Amino acid sequence: MSKLIIEPSPHIKSGVTTQKIMLSVIIALLPALFASVWIFGLRALIMTVICCTSCVIFEWACRKIMKRNNTISDLSAVVTGMLLAFNLPVTLPFYMAIIGCFVAIVIVKQFFGGIGQNFANPAITGRIVLMLSFTSYMTTWAEPFYYRNAGEIVTTSTPLVSETPASLAD
């Protein structure tokens, strides 16, 4: 019994790293980013870049101030920035998005020990704080650029409801 070794997980060693996992998540989120740029315009891309950059800067600064090793290369801050940007209205002022990034990275993620140690999802917690702080901005959503005229939008169960039986017979 003296050879029993008790260690924390993970017990299986593999070549998968945090950086590879986060890169896979970023790649998986790219179609959603392309769609948001197509639907909401270039501001969606700018919002995503600002959120990703802010999250990386806040993580770097926080790790530097706390005298911990640099972890920005694991790309988890970029994933947090993308997830937060995807959860914000495209019309939100950029400084408010940066406040959400600060809450997500510094308060929720880094103050509780970094990746894997946080008590909640950092991006969603940042959104909740923004929702509580800036309710009017967070509940106003942009009309998509894609729909140029009202005829392209169908909000009823079927477009045939607007047709009369006489016009259908013609």
Q: Language-model features: where?
A:
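N-terminal signal-anchor module of multipass membrane proteins
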Residues: M1-V56
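Short, amphipathic, aromatic/basic-enriched membrane-interface segments that mark the entry/exit
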Residues: I12-M22, R63-S73, T91-L92
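Hydrophobic, membrane-inserted alpha-helices
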Residues: A28-A35, C55-E59, A77-A85, C101-V108
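Transmembrane helix interruption/hinge and helix-loop junction motifs
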Residues: W38-A44, L88-A97
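C-terminal ends of transmembrane helices
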Residues: I57-R68, I105-G116
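Charge-biased, low-complexity intrinsically disordered regions
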Residues: K64-I65, N69, L83-L84, L88, ...
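Cytoplasmic-side transmembrane-helix entry/capping segments in multi-pass membrane proteins
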Residues: N70-T80, A97-F102, Q117-I128
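Long hydrophobic alpha-helical segments that form multi-pass transmembrane helix bundles
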Residues: Q117, P122-D170
